[in-house]
């Protein structure tokens, strides 16, 4: 029996990409949104009608295959199914706790992140995994001819998909930060610069809760070029390896894991220079803190990121000890790590 379980696991891993593709299909067909729009579980024919309506097509969906997609995703607990027995047995499909995170109009929707991670341009990078193990070559560059930042700058469509994905997790991450880190944020006076802040969603959300804070959103020129005007937010473009706008505190989310230790130290030292409040100033870092022995919620996802990040950016995820060593090398001796109910943790690095 143990041998059969081992065989079963290999089959499951072999076809695990189908999970992602079925999820992507459900998002592209807007199945969760169609069910949600009815306010109750609906039939397969109603889902098909919604798909046809959304696509403005005269061609009817492939209902037999749609039923297979739904059967598969019900088994994966993405949707629910129960049967009504009137004159004939009819299956009714509803939303689960998982599919609610796929609603396009839901503030905390993960749909854009799924679409980015399953995009052919993203998936292409994974085909160079063996190559990376053998010679540490830049896998994104192997797949696309340049690094991810250059590629995003030169390809507006991918840049939009990438920025939408990053923006989609802002409400999730900032919601957890704002509810679990009130003391750490409430003591900040003056200006906060969000380094690598994307299109400015995080700093804007922070300023809604703490109106006394002045916000700067700092990112690469091609990112800032697409950033919307946000009340009170100053958008500044530049290079984190050159200099960072002056502020009383620095916020960085998912930036340092993109780079080597050497490059991170350079960025962190630039952050130190940028902080004007030398007595109370600090850097607030939102990053994954790996614990390979842990089996808590999100730990599996953290381990996936540990494989993903080196391939896409040449960076890496870090353990608590590795974070402390890195920050010590950059000149920070007072460090505090706080676990919150999302994938990354809060790492505070104080000037004194």
Swiss-Prot record:
Q: Where in the cell is it found?
A: Cytoplasm
List the GO cellular component terms.
cytoplasm
Report the record's Gene Ontology biological process terms. Answer: methylation
Pfam families in alphabetical order: Dimerisation, Methyltransf_2
Q: In which domain of life is the source organism classified?
A: Eukaryota
Q: Which reactions does this protein catalyse? A: desmethylxanthohumol + S-adenosyl-L-methionine = xanthohumol + S-adenosyl-L-homocysteine + H(+); xanthogalenol + S-adenosyl-L-methionine = 4'-O-methylxanthohumol + S-adenosyl-L-homocysteine + H(+)
Q: What class of enzyme is it?
A: transferase
Give the pH dependence of activity as annotated.
Answer: Optimum pH is 9.0.
**Subunit and partners:** Homodimer.
Q: Would you tell me the protein name for this molecule?
A: Desmethylxanthohumol 6'-O-methyltransferase
């Amino acid at each position: 029996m143990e041998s059969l379980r081992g065989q079963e696991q290999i089959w499951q891993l072999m076809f695990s990409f189908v999970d992602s593709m079925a999820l992507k299909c459900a998002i592209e067909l807007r199945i969760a949104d169609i069910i949600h729009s009815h306010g109750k579980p609906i039939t397969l024919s109603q889902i098909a009608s919604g798909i046809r309506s959304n696509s403005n097509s005269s061609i009817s969906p492939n209902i037999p295959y749609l039923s297979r997609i739904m059967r598969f995703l019900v088994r994966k607990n993405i949707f629910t199914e129960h049967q009504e027995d009137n004159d004939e047995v009819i299956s009714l499909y509803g939303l689960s706790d998982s599919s609610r995170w796929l609603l396009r109009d839901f503030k905390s929707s993960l749909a854009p992140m799924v679409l980015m991670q399953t995009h052919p341009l993203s998936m292409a990078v994974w085909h160079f995994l063996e190559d990376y193990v053998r010679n540490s070559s830049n896998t994104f560059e192997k797949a696309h001819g340049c690094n991810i930042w250059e590629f995003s700058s030169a390809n507006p469509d991918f840049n939009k998909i990438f920025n939408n994905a990053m923006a989609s997790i802002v409400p999730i991450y900032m919601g957890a930060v704002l509810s679990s880190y009130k003391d750490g944020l409430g003591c900040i006076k003056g200006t906060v610069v969000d380094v690598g802040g994307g299109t400015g969603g995080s700093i804007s959300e922070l300023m809604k809760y703490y109106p006394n804070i002045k916000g700067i959103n700092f990112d690469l020129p091609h990112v800032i070029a697409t950033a919307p005007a946000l009340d009170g937010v100053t958008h500044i473009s530049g290079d984190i390896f050159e200099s960072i706008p002056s502020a009383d505190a620095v916020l960085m989310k998912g930036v340092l894991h993109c780079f080597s230790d050497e490059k991170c130290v350079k960025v962190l030292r630039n952050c130190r220079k940028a902080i004007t409040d030398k007595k109370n100033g600090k850097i607030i870092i939102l990053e994954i803190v790996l614990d390979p022995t842990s089996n808590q919620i999100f730990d599996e996802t953290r381990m996936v990121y540990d494989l993903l990040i080196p391939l896409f950016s040449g960076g890496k995820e870090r353990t608590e000890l590795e974070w402390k060593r890195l920050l010590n090398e950059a000149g920070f001796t007072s460090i505090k790590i706080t676990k919150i109910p999302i994938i990354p943790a809060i790492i505070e690095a104080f000037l004194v």
